[in-house]
């Protein structure tokens, strides 16, 4: 749905024939619908959290400019998770009970997502997780990044079509990787006639990858898949310093990481729902608005635009999808919103985007890109939309 269609649908809501477009004073006077942003605004993930905050405001400003939601303006209420599960739970409860937010978004870590869900169960509110995930399904959850099923199979299919048949994997030793990611990787590699030579499980906090890289070099795989969640920058830098020959591939890929690796990412192939290089009017408008919004900050640049993180686009997408579903349902109540989500299709920066039948995950194109020397990603292929698979 484009902005014109969204504006037209916004004419019909709780105010009947009176709308924000006709009577803007009514919208200004109406009590706002609050959106809760629960993000890491301090600590190592501050930039991710701040990007989510800015992108949430972009979505809210756009919706308010089109007349608001159900005849009421949207307003953002913000809390810092401090990257702590206990703090996230406390702040989620504050947003839900004190601020009476209609939904929660902005979380980066899976532990933050789980804490937000725990709090949301009491208040019966929607949690929108703006990150890729293992395929987590819950009646109160919408994930706006790609699930494992939407990442692994398309990337392995594309790689093995190009001749890569032997794979070594280096992954963070977390439960979702053991239960979902690596089994999906094994299945996809086997399905296409390849071999998964070994999986190297690394605990969070690992900073020296030398021994693992030496063992991989001795095995001589054609592909090395990495899912290092806590410090991919150090891993990629060491991978290049060892002059590794296998093609490096990953499901943790975006322009900001390429910049942080100071050229070491060049040539790596990644999979994501969003890259800045998507050439569409919607994406260019989004990047231009974001760049203007952060003009007074030290946000890194890539060409004419401030660097966008995929988490930010996922946050923007989640609020847009929530607002359209609530508008269609005539309510912000979670069950009504979840039911309406499955019928939605919006043009977003990533492209045309819908939601799975259960309302748990987005359905959009899976983008395969290759990091370039200028830190951009060249789009190699777009696959899908691929249906997600629930993993609990």
Q: What is each PLM-predicted segment?
A:
Residues 239-316, 383-389:
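Extracellular/periplasmic periplasmic-binding protein-like sensory domains
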Residues 36-55, 79-85, 108, 172-179, ...:
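Extracytoplasmic "Venus flytrap"
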Residues 1-18:
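N-terminal secretory signal peptides and thylakoid transit peptides that target proteins
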Residues 47, 51-52, 69-135, 144, ...:
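Beta-alpha junction/loop-to-helix N-cap segments that form part of ligand/metal-binding clefts
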Residues 120, 181-276:
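Extracellular/periplasmic bilobed ligand-binding domains
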Residues 88, 144-167, 179-181, 209-210, ...:
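Hydrophobic alpha-helical segments within soluble ligand-binding/sensing domains
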Residues 295-312, 316-378, 385:
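Segments of small-molecule ligand-sensing domains
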Residues 143-204, 223:
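An alpha-beta-alpha
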């Amino acid at each position: 749905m484009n902005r014109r269609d969204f504006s037209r649908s916004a004419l019909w809501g709780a105010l009947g024939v009176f709308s924000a477009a006709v009577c803007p004073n009514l919208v200004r006077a109406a009590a706002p619908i609050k959106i809760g942003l629960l993000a890491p605004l301090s600590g190592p993930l501050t930039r991710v959290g701040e990007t989510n905050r800015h992108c949430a405001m972009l979505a809210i400003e756009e919706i308010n400019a089109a007349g608001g939601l159900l005849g009421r303006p949207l307003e953002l209420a913000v809390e810092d998770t401090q990257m702590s599960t206990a703090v996230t739970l406390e702040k989620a409860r504050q947003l839900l009970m004190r601020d009476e937010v209609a939904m929660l978004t902005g979380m980066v870590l899976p532990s933050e997502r789980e804490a937000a869900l725990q709090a949301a169960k009491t208040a019966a509110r929607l949690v929108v997780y703006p990150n890729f995930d293992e395929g987590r399904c819950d009646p109160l959850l919408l994930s706006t990044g790609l699930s494992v099923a939407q990442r692994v199979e398309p990337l392995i299919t594309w790689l093995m079509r190009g001749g890569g048949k032997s794979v070594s994997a280096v992954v963070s030793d977390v439960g979702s990787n053991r239960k979902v990611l690596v089994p999906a990787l094994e299945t996809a590699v086997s399905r296409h006639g390849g071999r998964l030579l070994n999986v190297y499980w690394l605990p969070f906090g690992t900073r020296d990858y030398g021994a693992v890289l030496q063992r991989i070099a001795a095995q001589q795989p054609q592909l090395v898949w990495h899912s290092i969640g806590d410090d991919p920058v150090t891993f990629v830098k060491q991978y290049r310093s060892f002059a590794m020959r296998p093609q490096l591939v990953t499901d943790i890929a975006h322009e900001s990481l390429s910049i942080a690796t100071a050229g070491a990412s060049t040539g790596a192939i990644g999979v994501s729902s969003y890259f800045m290089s998507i050439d569409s009017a919607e994406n260019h408008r989004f990047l231009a608005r974001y760049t203007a919004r952060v003009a007074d900050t030290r946000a890194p640049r890539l060409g004419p635009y401030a660097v966008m993180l995929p988490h930010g686009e996922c946050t923007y997408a989640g609020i847009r999808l929530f607002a359209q579903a609530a508008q269609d349902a005539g309510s912000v109540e979670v069950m009504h919103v979840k039911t309406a989500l499955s019928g939605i299709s919006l043009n977003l920066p990533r492209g045309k985007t819908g939601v799975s039948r259960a309302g748990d995950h987005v359905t959009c194109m899976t983008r395969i890109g290759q990091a370039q020397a200028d830190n951009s990603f060249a789009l190699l292929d777009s696959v899908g939309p691929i249906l997600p698979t629930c993993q609990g």
